[in-house]
Amino acid sequence: MNCPDCGNERTRVIDTETSADGTSVRRRRECQRCSFRFTTYERPEWESLQVKKRDGTIESFDRQKLRAGIERAVEKRDVTETTVTALVDDVESELQGREARIVSSSLIGELVSESLRTLDKVAYIRFVSVYKAFSEPQEFLRELDAVLDAELDDFEASNSSQ
């Protein structure tokens, strides 16, 4: 591992921790030339996952692209970086757990939508407005009505059980 500060190839591992879910390893490293300390993360390299887009083209699954879409949706919301990482990990694990090596972009959108709907309603609306390509205000209103109806149903169910 090269030092990101001076480029030296000789670094040593100071500390190693496995993530809570066991899917990655965090290592603290120190450069043996300049003593710069930095963190690296290791995760298993999955068999190549492909994404079939709406226009029929196929491209490699891009974890960073998924993360960027989620980060745009949760921007200026009370959602931590750790939560975003966990959401990305969950979606990626779900996709990798499927037999098919080619998944549709709509499946990815549905998985993210489901997670955001329970996490943060505003982030959910932001995400689905892009994912479903809303072009009219009525589309926002329909989605908001669905979210509010679901919340009302949940509220009524919790009050009737008391």
UniProtKB/Swiss-Prot annotation:
Essential cofactor(s): Zn(2+)
Annotated InterPro entries: ATP-cone_dom (IPR005144), NrdR-like_N (IPR055173), RNR_NrdR-like (IPR003796)
Any one of the GO BP annotations: negative regulation of DNA-templated transcription
Keyword set, alphabetical order: ATP-binding, DNA-binding, Metal-binding, Nucleotide-binding, Plasmid, Repressor, Transcription, Transcription regulation, Zinc, Zinc-finger
Cofactor annotation comment: Binds 1 zinc ion.
ZnF segments: unnamed: 3-34
Record-linked Pfam families: ATP-cone, Zn_ribbon_NrdR
Molecular function in Gene Ontology: ATP binding; DNA binding; zinc ion binding
Keyword Nucleotide-binding belongs to the record: yes
Domain ATP-cone: 49-139
Purpose: Negatively regulates transcription of bacterial ribonucleotide reductase nrd genes and operons by binding to NrdR-boxes.
UniProt similarity note: Belongs to the NrdR family.
Family matches, as PANTHER family: TRANSCRIPTIONAL REPRESSOR NRDR
HAMAP family xrefs: NrdR (MF_00440)
Name assigned to this protein: Transcriptional repressor NrdR
Protein's organism: Halomicrobium mukohataei (strain ATCC 700874 / DSM 12286 / JCM 9738 / NCIMB 13541) (Haloarcula mukohataei)
Lineage: Archaea, Methanobacteriati, Methanobacteriota, Stenosarchaea group, Halobacteria
